[in-house]
């Protein structure tokens, strides 16, 4: 039923609650952060009936502005626009608006050069790791030769390491998430993988076993 006095942020709160029930905690925290930081302040005094295409385009342009004190990356901007589009779709599905408004999320692609170790740098790192044996060094070695993400490495337990069959069972990840309270502090969260493919068996090189 259409509510003529509903504000955009009222629907934003409803949308966030739906995401809280349907998404992984890490995904919800990310959405909540983007909503609180970028979406809610802009639409604070805007009624849904006033959220027309020119207003939405102005919002999009504000995200793209190079004059911003802290310019956003294209990935962040694209995610914000997708969230706004999802909220606009909910507005239509619940009968608050008569049509679906849409903000194009496609942006010019930036291809930053990804720094990688040179062969000499990798040899220097391995020489150091071999000379300084410890938990931290072993974890770096694992990351270097298994390709595990930092969160996956930190979440490894002894029962995930199968020495006789020489493989690792990646079952969890650790993430540092912002707490959803007034302190805005962060906490470490152990969770399962986001996708089936992330729950996987990774070969363990034989030369790493003595480490």
Where do the model's predicted regions map?
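Generic recognition of well-ordered alpha-helical segments
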Residues: 10, 14, 33-37, 58, ...
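Helix-turn-helix-type domain boundary/helix-start signal
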Residues: 21, 46-49, 70, 115, ...
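Conserved hydrophobic/aromatic pocket- or pore-lining residues that grip, position, or stack substrates
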Residues: 39, 56, 84, 125, ...
